[in-house]
Amino acid sequence: MAAPGPLPAAALSPGAPTPRELMHGVAGVTSRAGRDREAGSVLPAGNRGARKASRRSSSRSMSRDNKFSKKDCLSIRNVVASIQTKEGLNLKLISGDVLYIWADVIVNSVPMNLQLGGGPLSRAFLQKAGPMLQKELDDRRRETEEKVGNIFMTSGCNLDCKAVLHAVAPYWNNGAETSWQIMANIIKKCLTTVEVLSFSSITFPMIGTGSLQFPKAVFAKLILSEVFEYSSSTRPITSPLQEVHFLVYTNDDEGCQAFLDEFTNWSRINPNKARIPMAGDTQGVVGTVSKPCFTAYEMKIGAITFQVATGDIATEQVDVIVNSTARTFNRKSGVSRAILEGAGQAVESECAVLAAQPHRDFIITPGGCLKCKIIIHVPGGKDVRKTVTSVLEECEQRKYTSVSLPAIGTGNAGKNPITVADNIIDAIVDFSSQHSTPSLKTVKVVIFQPELLNIFYDSMKKRDLSASLNFQSTFSMTTCNLPEHWTDMNHQLFCMVQLEPGQSEYNTIKDKFTRTCSSYAIEKIERIQNAFLWQSYQVKKRQMDIKNDHKNNERLLFHGTDADSVPYVNQHGFNRSCAGKNAVSYGKGTYFAVDASYSAKDTYSKPDSNGRKHMYVVRVLTGVFTKGRAGLVTPPPKNPHNPTDLFDSVTNNTRSPKLFVVFFDNQAYPEYLITFTA
């Protein structure tokens, strides 16, 4: 089924090539029989016998030493939105960097000469994959002529994929019909190749939208149309291809919006298959899209896809739903109540009967009215790691492929959410170390309390090889507890609001500034409304309030900067990786001054070409502090015998502080930007 909206006739031409014809334009791909005979196939995954042997070997190896290395935990994947075709093909909009994306197949864009490194996409591929990728691509040049529209297949080398499809994409040429047709055929070839080689997932970056000038909105419309068409008319019912990913870079708002618009257009005529989370909604009801405001996270742990997202577990469509309940299996509150009420009275009655009989640490009932096959009821107060391990083993024994569970024990049982997140992921790692090719493919934690999303994300990052990657997440606006005095953001995640002179808010900030900077002239004061940064800061504040057993952890401080840094700080906050730009005397963190006069120095708030200077008024979580020293990269421990209990910040003088240094990016929120002149 094609996505709504007009497309040039060439893009959906009834005379499009057949799958067999399409395959002739792919260097490195032979027929199924040919692949089985081919001794030197570029992709072992394409040879069924080799693939089975590889699996047996992998299984023996894992069973022999029972080791599970960190490399088996792939990068966290930021899923902005997802939809499913009526034929069951899952489409996901992914935000991130191509270097840290994982899938069976990833598509790359290459020039006519097939030399990697010319554009940002192929340069990124070459950077991570290594020189062998170029060597394999050079070998493929001898098999197929180099012309626009052809694709060349290589292995993934050091990328987190089994294969790369390198496409020679067309120039936009002001929308010439041939450009549409060539790009459409490239997409068809990629989908057909994945189908023929029995891969299960493919990731499409926005190829052609850089120097080749394909408009992003046009590309989004075209590729979704082709994928829908493939799903409805070409893809077999038993197809191994289960997921198609559309990748946009983290800060590419235009590309993200283009896909969200197309997702929404399609979902309006297929509402039962849509899963496009909107502002103020965690159930996927379609509304007007402005920017993504909900996030699910995914990462690969061995053969398991681990997901975490806020939502209602009672609406999950999976094989197994886990109900975290009391030891007596009769709790009817919170998430457990939602599950039992959704399942129906018959399930509740059966649960009571089974609870009265001898049973294991959990009991199993049918799914009832829920969209699952069974419900596993577990006591939330028990050891979470052991409980989750038991659930996963039960799913595997029954050959189920998917399970959704809550953040077990974080409700009435009162367990520490950080410990729970670690325990759940540890259990999945344990399971993956024992099962190299399990039936169970997807484990999802559905979070009722949105504030737990960051906690699970932090736990995932501990196992993420690319933890240094700066993912900007998106959250439901209703979960951010935005300040009441903020201007309506119209579902946007970020905006700047200029304060009017004479307003009480303006006067408060002005007075704080002029207390030590009376000789400077204020040009304007702007309030920074950044929902994501505010959410991250508030989560950190709540953690610190609990840890220190009081709420007196916050100060309003100053930070001077240059004009070039302003856009970055407004959008992303203070990044300690920039530490050392102006000061490192008390540690390699971000520095904030008690008095505005300190930050007003030209060393810190460097004047721009027009003489304007810039200073932030910042909420900073200073908490419990101590004196800093050069070389610190984190605050020192409060007690040398307990190295994990750190001070929250450091200062120049504990009795009379003039400045504070923090070492974690979400420990400061830039609330106001003052533009001034000397």
UniProtKB/Swiss-Prot annotation:
Keywords: Glycosyltransferase, NAD, Nucleotidyltransferase, Nucleus, Repeat, Transcription, Transcription regulation, Transferase. Residues 1-67 are annotated as: Disordered. The keyword Transcription regulation applies. Residues 49-58 have a biased composition (Basic residues). Residues 482-678 form the PARP catalytic domain. Residues 1-19 have a biased composition (Low complexity). One of its GO terms (molecular function) is NAD+-protein-aspartate ADP-ribosyltransferase activity. GO terms for cellular component: cytoplasm; nucleus. Mono-ADP-ribosyltransferase that mediates mono-ADP-ribosylation of target proteins. Acts as a negative regulator of transcription. Belongs to the ARTD/PARP family. This is Protein mono-ADP-ribosyltransferase PARP15. It comes from Homo sapiens (Human). The lineage of its organism: Eukaryota, Metazoa, Chordata, Craniata, Vertebrata. The gene is PARP15.
